[in-house]
Amino acid sequence: MVKIRLKRVGKKFNVIYKIVVADSRAPRDGRFIEEVGNYNPHSKSLNLKKEAIISWLNQGVKPSDTVKRLLTREKVWEEFTSLKNNKN
């Protein structure tokens, strides 16, 4: 199963997360299919490739709980659900 989740990078006590599409069986910091954004929890900055994320969500990829919360904060999740409802 493929998921959108966080990959931890950076130094100790100075963590940055990459938002990646990865197989759920792969290790947290292991192989991934595509990088679709990054998140810095210290400065609360979030950069997303919205088109790529919506494309993956349309293919049936499930986000982790934390990624879903970040997508909701940036209004990407609402955009995806509205596109999905308009399609049906």
UniProtKB/Swiss-Prot annotation:
Keywords for the protein's UniProt record, in alphabetical order: Ribonucleoprotein, Ribosomal protein
Keyword Ribonucleoprotein found: yes
Gene3D superfamilies attached to this UniProt entry: 3.30.1320.10
Cellular component, GO, one term: cytoplasm
InterPro entries in the record: Ribosomal_bS16, Ribosomal_bS16_CS, Ribosomal_bS16_dom_sf
Molecular function GO labels: structural constituent of ribosome
Biological process terms in GO annotation: translation
Family: Belongs to the bacterial ribosomal protein bS16 family.
Protein name: Small ribosomal subunit protein bS16
Organism (species): Mycoplasmopsis pulmonis (strain UAB CTIP) (Mycoplasma pulmonis)
Highest classification ranks of the organism: Bacteria, Bacillati, Mycoplasmatota, Mycoplasmoidales, Metamycoplasmataceae
